[in-house]
Amino acid sequence: AADELGFYVATELPFWGEWTPAIADALAPEGEAILRAYGHHPSFVLLSLGNEHRGDRAARAGLVARLRALDPSRLYAQGANNDLETPSLAPHDDCWITARLPAADGTRRYVNVRGAHATPDRADGHLQTGPGGTRTDYRAAIAASPLPVVSHEIGQYATYPRYAEIARHRGVFAAHNLERFRAKAEAAGLRARADDFARASSALAALCYREEIEAALRTPGFGGFELLGLQDFPGQGTALVGLLDVFLESKGAISPAEFRRFCAPHVLLARFDRHTWTAGVTFIADLEFAHYGPADFTPGEVRWSLGEAAGSLPAPAAAHGGLRPLGRLECRLPDTARACRLELTLTHVPSGATNAYPLWVYPAANTPVPPGLVLTRRFDAAAESTLAAGGTVVLCADAARPFPGTPGGGFTPDFWCWSMFKNVPGTLGLAIDATHPALACFPTETHSNWQWFHLAGAAQPVGLDALPAGLRPIIEVIDNPERAQRLGLIFEVRVGPGRLLVCGLDLPALGATHPEARALLSSLLRYAASPAFAPEVPVEPAALVTALHG
């Protein structure tokens, strides 16, 4: 099937762990048998000694030499992501499959060639710590490598369980792990939220997979990328990291046609600084064409549209097998007084490749605090006094004094699963009541999208265990099913005769550099000053002190 469909098959020997001469001797007959049985297939391109090895490097090199002598027509590698945190170039290999490389400056730093969790116990990829936008690539990371570099097991974004699957697991495949997670969700009062959590986390995972793949395609001379898999992995702590479930069925987060916009033989790409913009400024994007199809393309054009603006750029002839620049697009964004979402759409003629990118445009002006409303960063005596007198308080987090017990902020879903790597936030994105009037001036879907990139990264989710079980936040932070904590990012409560709106973001500080933070604060202030602000859940001040200050 791979021969007929044009797949390149990278085969690995069945080993993961510490390498010794005895292991090399045991695996040699397996490798030789693979070459004899499958070596006549044109799809069989690469043979690797296995996955994430440590140990005797000389033994690895010796086995590669032995296998190459038997069949010199293959490409060979001593393993995929060998030596994990401290990888180094292996002699005699034909490519370097890794998540990170030594920096070219001779320091002891390492630089990533995947977007998230290049070291799984540390959130250090550009999807966690980067500037946002779509300009990041890995050309600096691969510059010093004499071999083609292939990024290893990109993605691995955890999603929330879909408990309806439990009934489909029978016999020895009974999903006791999912049953345990379901019981935890029920005990935490989160069972009714499970379907929404599954949809929102899967949608975010699809966004992140797209950026992972496009960053690889944006890198000139890159050797390629490997996804760990498209389906969930039910073992090793339960890693629900697939766009498909364990039955290879879609979770509904992305369609095949949408996936092929950014993962196909030819892909249109746009590089721009950020997804969030101030009204009236000039948007600039550099367009490129990643073309790895079988044939060259004759000259054509790229047609684009953004809101009410549209145009085209000439597209030169494109030889297959590389990344081709197409030119720069410049467009003045609407001078709107109300936040809006736009979509940059691109079409390449004659290939027919299309792609689209969401952008958000926000008013430049700050919204003053309405009269009679108190904006604060602490639930202190002054806030309590205002509420006791029937007043209205909006409380934003203070970046300098995090809420107690908060898992911290993060845009991407958890890596692999929290039960294995626990010194990261471990959350799975946002579940948003997008139609709530508090967000009337802040366009959003029910899941995290790129306008939440900087906000989610700076978030202080509030643990809600001390607050009433009936409290449903306007925006929830989805916790992993192992920890199963109720977490709120924005929620409203009644405190005596007063009204309180809590936001786990330091919006006043974030607004200095991020227009989306200014717009979100404006939307919250407008709502809190309106008659629509009528919280129903009563909370005692002492419970709020516990939740917000420990």
Please provide the spans of the model-predicted regions.
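Substrate-binding/catalytic cleft of secreted carbohydrate-active enzymes
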Residues: 1-245
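Extracytoplasmic/secreted cell-surface and envelope-processing proteins
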Residues: 18-20, 56-59, 86-87, 395-396, ...
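Aromatic-rich peripheral "rim/lid" segments of glycoside hydrolase catalytic domains that contact
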Residues: 66, 70, 228-293, 302
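Catalytic beta-strand/loop cores that center a nucleophilic Ser/Cys/Thr
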Residues: 122-136, 402, 419-515, 532-550
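Beta-strand-rich binding/interaction modules
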Residues: 280-316, 326-333, 338-349
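Short, exposed coil/turn segments at beta-strand boundaries within extracellular/luminal domains
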Residues: 349-355
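Low-complexity, Pro/Ser/Thr- and charge-rich linker/hinge segments at domain boundaries
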Residues: 360-378
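Short alpha-beta junction capping motif
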Residues: 372-419, 497, 503, 524
